[in-house]
Amino acid sequence: NNGVAQGGIISTPEGKWYGLLFRDNGSVGRIPYLTQVTWTNNWPMMTAPATLDIPANTIGISGIVTSDDFNYSAPVKLHTAWQWNHNPQNSYWSMTARPGYFRSTTSRVDTDIKLARNTLTQRTYGSTCSGVVSLDVANMKDGDYAGLSMFQDKYGFVGVKMVGTTKSIVMVNASSGSMVEVASAPLNQNTVYFRID
């Protein structure tokens, strides 16, 4: 069983049936499982042979993680590796206002990253992974945060916090359910790099 729980059955144009199921695997997310489906007395029966005879995809699949320099040509459409944490508010982000940059502006101030709009995300890859981001924080406003986070239900982040006209680099731990600033340092430059491993 291994915790395989949610999913469904699908049919191909050729009339073959498969089960596509998922198993929760902590920070990796949900791992997909493909099983063969046969029908017994009009009831689907899933079997898991060691191999399935499925032809290779000839269309091509976009990767689920990618590096991005945000140099897109019109019409601008984010790479499919990117996901929004909520439905995006399109008037508050742009890749054309400053070519080569993803620009996000604040529509409101939130107290929790899980509530913040226009949070751009990518899936983690495997049980360990790294993420690096370069930020231009020159135009931040009072109450703004910008940074890099790894989150599911519990989370933490490193970022820049703006209070009044003062910028600070902060490290926040929210694994207890509320944001706790565990480290802070003054910031006197407009470009910062963050990395999470």
Predicted regions, residues:
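Carbohydrate-active catalytic/glycan-binding domains of CAZyme proteins
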Residues: 1-197
